[in-house]
């Protein structure tokens, strides 16, 4: 669609040239003596009178959160007009306040006290960021969520959303300075709040024409920016900014103690993917010990043979087990102790005791949880899934999970159940199709199948066959997908047999995109994607988040499985402690193996040099909290209980950090066996 342009006469006016009608903005400023208006405008004149915006046209249908003005939309749901969300911009008389925050200010039409909660590092202003002309520390805007709940004013930290806020502020100031009528187009009515004019001077016609054309240009720019996909390019600005902020935070954290240095190194090497255009991080990360050089012809030949062998066979796929149910499928897929019913009734809750479920199901927690979730959602009937075939697949899937302390089928069951609860958020219940829900729960169930108990970096450093096969890129995640779909090729396991070819392709694409998002090195990118999407909608004044495109939906689904994979610190403290003990034991076993192979021991993997309490506080502060904070903003008022539990768990570990570095409790061989 060609861009709209102003008329030739008004373009001449805008340029300040042509005939006697030329009237540039410098002339306008001089003619209106704006400095006098700024100096003499009273508080009442510069205050904001809030009015509700016009509803957006029903381009897509919408889902309403009970008690909230926040909606997510998809083509499958019904449309509801949005509630009031008012927009306030700083007047020229309050420029100092605006400059201090770095942008526009949107506020809900109603205000009430909010429960104070600690904010993550993303909201901390930095002098370093202020000095960079391309980065703005913070702007402020209202939540896209409920007025009744008093979600209050939120800081805008992603660059794309700050750009929208700044342009909306410019638009509002233009209307106030020129005193022209706002656009009658309902799409633009929510971009500026009505307020008393700065003056009552009748401007020359050419000035009015110029102002109208400028307003039209701004509206066109905002139209394009507000509809742009925030999934990648613009969110990469936020990702780069968040990396810089996290590096700065972790450099301070590292200075606090020796254990702080190790925790910081671990967080950087695990949760931050490496960008070639990024400056080197402030914390010196130990150089990984590399394997033998691959420059020689003999070595290249060996690697080529290994790669060929790996490509010819998907490792880890063992002989499939025959069905054990004889056609009759028990209530939970397999025979379980009667007491399991109490725990299975809590599958809709955040944090059922999955360890107890595993015990009462005779070590079939993944089968009983996944089977029950799909049955509860009526997906057996929707997709004509044969229950016996599904159980056969799930039992073989469990069989292909290794006996690791952490990355085992109990963890997979926990992630699948967490996905189910996240999908139950009122804002999401009508957004995703049944096929997308099926794929999401399946992705949670298979996301770590045949995990060896070692990290991607270890596999790369040790020249593991999988690293060679997948070219060091998301090595484990690609392997999990290969094994999961290889199992589906057996006719006894293909519970998707009644799906159409198109449905199978869609299912496979969703699962692949989701499981690849469980690569922890993608954390900052996933956080930036989600944060940018949420904040862009706030600034745009839209209380409707459109999810009618695949990229928008998969962005939310990828965030969900990443949330579920990092959900341990948000669960009841007893479960959190058990998961923490398990992951630490797995890390230590990797450290033992690295020591045996002569590799440098990875951060947090030296069993004789780990401060558990401080590592968990750092993990929550810099990884888990910012992610869940952003998610809670998206699904508000849902997930507030999750944030509260996360805060309680943080305080539990914080209170147990030894005060003196020299008396810090470190884990030793004796501690391991206590």
UniProtKB/Swiss-Prot annotation:
GO terms for biological process: adenylate cyclase-inhibiting G protein-coupled receptor signaling pathway; cAMP catabolic process; cAMP-mediated signaling; negative regulation of adenylate cyclase-activating G protein-coupled receptor signaling pathway; negative regulation of locomotion; sleep. Binds 2 divalent metal cations per subunit. Site 1 may preferentially bind zinc ions, while site 2 has a preference for magnesium and/or manganese ions. GO terms for cellular component: synapse. Residues 15-24 have a biased composition (Gly residues). A divalent metal cation 1 binds at residues 411, 447-448, 565. CDD domains: HDc (cd00077). It catalyses: 3',5'-cyclic AMP + H2O = AMP + H(+). Residues 328-660 form the PDEase domain. Residues 39-62 have a biased composition (Low complexity). It is an enzyme of class 3 (hydrolase). Residues 1-82 are annotated as: Disordered. The keyword S-adenosyl-L-methionine does not apply. Expressed in dorsal D (DD) motor neurons and several other neurons at the L1 stage. Expression in DD neurons decreases gradually beginning in the late L1 stage. Highly expressed in adult ventral D (VD) motor neurons, but diminished in adult DD motor neurons. Belongs to the cyclic nucleotide phosphodiesterase family. Hydrolyzes the second messenger 3',5'-cyclic AMP (cAMP), which is a key regulator of many important physiological processes. Antagonizes dorsal D (DD) motor neuron respecification by reducing levels of cAMP. This is Probable 3',5'-cyclic-AMP phosphodiesterase pde-4.
């Amino acid at each position: 669609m060609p861009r709209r342009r102003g008329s030739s006469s008004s373009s001449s006016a805008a340029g300040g040239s042509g005939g006697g009608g030329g009237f540039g903005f410098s002339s306008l400023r001089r003619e209106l003596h704006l400095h006098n208006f700024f100096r003499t405008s009273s508080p009442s004149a510069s205050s904001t009178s809030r009015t509700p915006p016009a509803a957006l046209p029903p381009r897509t249908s919408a889902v309403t959160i009970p008690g909230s003005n926040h909606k997510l939309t998809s083509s499958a749901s019904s449309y509801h007009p949005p509630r009031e969300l008012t927009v306030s911009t700083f007047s020229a008389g309050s420029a100092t306040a605006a400059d201090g925050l770095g942008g526009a200010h949107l506020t809900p039409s109603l205000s009430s006290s909010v429960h104070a909660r600690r904010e993550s590092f993303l909201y901390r202003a930095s002098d370093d960021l202020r000095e960079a002309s391309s980065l703005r520390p913070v702007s402020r805007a209202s939540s896209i969520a409920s007025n009744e709940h008093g979600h209050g004013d939120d800081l805008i930290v992603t660059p794309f959303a700050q750009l929208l806020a700044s342009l909306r502020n410019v638009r509002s100031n233009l209307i106030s300075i020129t005193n022209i009528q706002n656009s009658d187009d309902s799409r633009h009515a929510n971009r500026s709040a009505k307020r008393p004019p700065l003056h009552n001077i009748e401007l020359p016609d050419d000035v009015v024409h110029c102002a109208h054309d400028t307003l039209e240009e701004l509206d066109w720019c905002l139209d394009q920016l507000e509809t742009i996909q925030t999934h990648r390019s613009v969110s990469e600005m936020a990702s780069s900014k968040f990396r810089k902020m996290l590096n700065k935070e972790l450099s301070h954290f590292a200075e606090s103690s020796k254990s702080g240095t190790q925790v910081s190194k671990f967080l950087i090497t695990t949760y931050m993917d490496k960008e070639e255009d990024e400056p080197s991080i402030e914390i010196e990360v130990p150089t990984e010990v590399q394997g033998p050089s691959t420059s020689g012809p003999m070595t290249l030949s060996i690697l080529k043979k290994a790669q060929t062998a790996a490509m010819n066979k998907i490792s880890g796929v063992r002989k499939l087990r025959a069905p054990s149910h004889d056609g009759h499928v028990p209530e939970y897929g397999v025979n379980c102790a009667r007491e399991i019913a109490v725990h299975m009734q809590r599958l809709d809750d955040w944090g059922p005791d999955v360890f107890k479920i595993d015990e009462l199901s005779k070590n079939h927690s993944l089968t009983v949880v996944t089977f029950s979730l799909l049955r509860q959602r009526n997906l057996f009937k929707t997709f004509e899934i044969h229950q016996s075939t599904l159980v056969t697949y799930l039992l073989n899937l469990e069989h292909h999970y290794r006996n690791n302390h952490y990355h085992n089928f109990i963890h997979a069951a926990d992630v699948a159940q967490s996905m189910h609860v996240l999908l139950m958020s009122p804002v999401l219940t009508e957004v995703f199709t049944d096929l997308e829900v099926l794929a999401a729960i399946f992705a949670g169930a298979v996301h770590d199948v045949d995990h060896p108990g070692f990290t991607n970096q270890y596999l790369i450093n040790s020249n593991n066959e999988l690293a060679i096969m997948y070219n060091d890129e998301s090595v484990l995640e690609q392997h999990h997908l290969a094994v999961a779909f290889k199992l589906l090729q057996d006719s006894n396991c293909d519970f998707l047999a009644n799906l159409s070819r198109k449905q199978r392709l869609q299912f496979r694409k969703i699962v692949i995109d989701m499981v690849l998002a469980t690569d922890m090195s993608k954390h900052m990118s996933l956080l930036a994607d989600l944060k940018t999407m949420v904040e862009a909608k706030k600034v745009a004044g839209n209380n409707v988040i459109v999810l009618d495109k695949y990229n928008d939906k998969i962005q939310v689904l990828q965030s969900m499985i990443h949330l579920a994979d990092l959900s341990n610190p948000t669960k009841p403290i007893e479960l959190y402690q058990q998961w923490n003990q398990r992951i630490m034991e797995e890390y230590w076993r990797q450290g033992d193996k690295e020591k045996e192979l002569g590799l440098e021991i990875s951060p947090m993997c030296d069993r004789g040099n780990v401060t558990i309490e401080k590592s968990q506080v750092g993990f929550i502060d810099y990884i888990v909290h910012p992610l869940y904070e952003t998610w809670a903003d998206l699904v508000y008022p849902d997930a507030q209980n999750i944030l509260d539990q996360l805060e309680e768990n943080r305080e539990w570990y914080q209170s147990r950090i030894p005060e003196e570095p020299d008396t810090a409790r470190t884990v030793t061989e004796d501690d391991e066996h206590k």
